[in-house]
A protein has these predicted regions:
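Glycine-centered flexibility motif
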Residues: 30-31, 99
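Short, Lys/Arg-enriched alpha-helical microdomains
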Residues: 33-42, 46, 121-128
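Short amphipathic alpha-helical segments with coiled-coil-like heptad repeat character
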Residues: 26-28, 51-52, 122-124, 128
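Accessory regions outside conserved functional cores
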Residues: 68-128
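Post-J-domain flank of DnaJ/Hsp40 co-chaperones
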Residues: 1-5, 45, 49-90
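N-terminal J-domain/J-like co-chaperone modules of DnaJ/Hsp40 proteins
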Residues: 1-29, 38-49
Length: 128
């Protein structure tokens, strides 16, 4: 593998690594289409291997079936990278967006994000 490490053990690790690499390789942030094609192919391969393997807060792994597809997460990250002034953070199975999110309120809702009033940021849980 050129970009992703074969030692990735869980879906959460894979998503974090993919997001980190998208911030470098996506064409909207200075990367190239060819680099993203390679990264996406690697993501899809590893996704099939770890899609049902998750980690709890103690770092112990467990299995739980998912209906998520690799394309859905790739599409979500690509859409978020188009929004100016936001920070994307992946914590466990959740995707959080912070920063200047107010101009992107309707788009965030359309992408399936919910507003967390106590943390004052948007989040998307694995089940929608």
């Amino acid at each position: 593998m050129k970009y992703l490490n074969d030692n990735i053990r869980t879906l959460e690790e894979l998503k974090k690594a993919y997001h980190r690499l998208c911030l470098k390789l996506h064409p909207d942030v200075g990367g190239s289409d060819e680099e993203m094609k390679i990264l996406n192919a690697e993501y899809e391969t590893l996704f099939e291997r770890v899609k049902n393997i998750h980690a709890n807060t103690d770092g112990e792994t467990y299995e739980r079936e998912t209906t998520e597809t690799p394309e859905a997460f790739q599409w979500l990250i690509a859409e978020l990278l188009k929004l100016d002034g936001i920070e994307i953070e992946i914590i466990g199975c959740f995707v959080w967006i912070t920063g200047d999110t107010k101009p992107h309120k309707e788009r965030s809702k359309a992408l399936g994000f919910r507003w967390h009033s106590k943390k004052c940021c948007w989040y998307k849980s694995p089940d929608g």
